[in-house]
Amino acid sequence: MKFVVSSNELYQQLQTVAKVINSKSSAAVPVLENILFSLSGAELTLVAADQSNRMTSRLSVESLEGDGSFAVRADTILNALRELPDQPIELEVREGKANLVYSNGHYSFLAIDSDSFPESIAFDPEHSIELPAPALLRAIESTVFAASDNERRPIMTGVFLDFFEEKLVAVASDGRILVRYTDNNIKSGQQMSFCLPSRIAALLSRYLLVKETGVVRIRFNQQNVSFELPHVELTARLLEGKYPNYNSVIPPSSTHHITVDLPLLISASKRVALFASKASTLIIFDFTEGSARISAQDFDISTSAEETIPASGQAAGSLVRIGFDYNCLQSLLQSFAGEQIDIALTDQTRAGVITPLQTEEGIEICTLIIPMKLIGE
C-alpha cells in the first residue's frame, strides 16, 4: 500500500489519537504502544488504544497503491513527523517495512501486523442520542474540576452525566465540593445515565470538543460509551458502581442569602489566602448585612490578613461566620461566569450553597462547599 498525505495534517491527527495511549497499558500489552493505520480508498483511519479506551480519527489522502492496514510505534512516527516542515509526504508499506519519503530524504521503520490490535466495540444503534457539541463541552468544563482523585472510590473520580427526556444534568464531587450543572435546553427524549472517567472527560473538553460547532453522537451500553464527531470517535469504558444521590446532599433551603460581587470576592480571597496556614488553607468569612469580612491567619509564623468587601442580601440581621478551604472555594468561584453570586448559608457547620446569578438561558448551576471547623468555636 502507498499513499500521499500532508505531513502537518497527519501529525496533528496522530497527536490527537495518541493522547489515549496509556504507558501502563502499553507495558502490559505491547501492541498498544502502536498506532493502527488503515487505508480504504482515499480515506486513512488512525486508531490508538489502551486497555479501556480507543480513539479513531479519519482523514483524506491520495491513494497511490492498494488498501490495507499496519501498525507503527506511536513515538517513532510522531518524532519523525515533528521535525518535518509541512509538505506532502509519501508513505509506502511492504513486507513489514514502512518507508516515509519527504522532499529531500526518507525514514524507514517497522510496520507490524495489525491483526493483534484490539477490535472496536459494537453498540446497539437504539442506545444513542445526539446533542450539540458546545453544550456537552460546557457541561464537562463546568464540572470535571470537582471530581475526586481518590481511587478508593472510583465512581467519584468521574463526571456523572444524567440524561432526562427534557434536560441534561452533569455532576462531579470530591466530597468537599460538589457541582451540579443543569442544561434545560437538551431534549434527548430518553432517560439514561453513566459516569465518565475524568481522564476521558478531559480528553473531550481539551482536544475533541473545543473547536466543534456541530453535533456529537453518543452511543452507549452497560460498560462503554462512544462519542462520535465528524472526523474522530472516542470510545471509553465507564466507571462502575452507583453514583450517590446528588440532590439529597444539597440543602433545600438556607437561613442566610448573601449576594457578593464575583471578581471582588475572587481577588480579595486570593490576597488574604497568601497569609493563611499552608497546612489548612483556611480562610474565614464574617458576613453581615452590607459587608463580607475575609480573614486568614498562620499561627506558626505569626502572619495574618483581613479584607472587607461589599455584600448585600439577608444575613438574618446577625453575624454569619464560616470557614472554607481556600483552594476548594477558589476552584468553584473561578468556574463561574457573570458578575455576582449568591451564597446560601445556615450555620458554620452546614454546607454552603453557591450559585452564579447570571447564566445562559436554560442553564442552572448549583455548587456545594463543605465548611471547615473553626478552632475554639
Residue ranges and their predicted role:
Residues 1-377:
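Structural preference for solvent-exposed beta-strand-turn elements
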